[in-house]
Amino acid sequence: MESRCAKAASVVGDTKSLPSLHAKVAEGESIKVVAFGSSSTEGTGQLPKSEIFASVLGRELSKELLTPVELINKGKGGDTIPKMVARLERDVLAQKPDLVVWQLGVNDVLQMEGVEGAISQMKAAIETLRAHGLPVVLVDLQVAPMVDRDKDTPVMQAAIEKEGARPGILHFHRQALMRRMIESGETTMDDLVLKDGLHMSRLGHLCTGQLLAQQIAKSSLEVKVSTR
């Protein structure tokens, strides 16, 4: 793992038991992951597809779990939560994945005046995914000048954090990761964000993909202990 990524690993979020994934890993079965999101997931053309965090995640998760991982990239640049929810059936449920990684929220913050409606749709979509027995990883907003100065950013972040605290849902703290890397002096904003002031650089994608794979792998290997 890239050393600058590893030094910020403590802030990316907790692990949780994911029984359905644990069973597949224990049997050595392949795992199908849908990466669902906007341009952070799809890529922007400024970086090769192989360097986008979703691609890094697929490679690294296979190494971590020692089992094949099929990564289906369903990112679409510019999408808000309502637009993603509109394609949830086609792009997620119809793929019959074992895990959904949902990167979300940034376009709602940047394009909307108030994000309460988007948050309500996020909650409903998560309920739909849970009803299908799918574990979900929520990837929150990035650190970037355009994002940091928007008044709706803290509102969206808080909503994602609240949903990510529920059973069967992981929260990958991308914003905390990037902020820790900058505040520690390991990197600068310019190292992690492209010149457009919004999208992640190669290093931002690399750290997100590597540490996300580690979080998912640890959760997949956890065994839920029942208490009586």
Located regions from the model:
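Compositionally biased, proline/threonine/alanine/serine-rich low-complexity intrinsically disordered stretches
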Residues: C5, T227-R228
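Alpha-helical cap/lid subdomain in secreted, periplasmic
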Residues: V56-T67, T80-T227
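N-terminal secretory targeting signals
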Residues: M1-S3
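Serine-esterase "nucleophile elbow" of acetyl-processing enzymes
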Residues: C5-G77, R87-K96
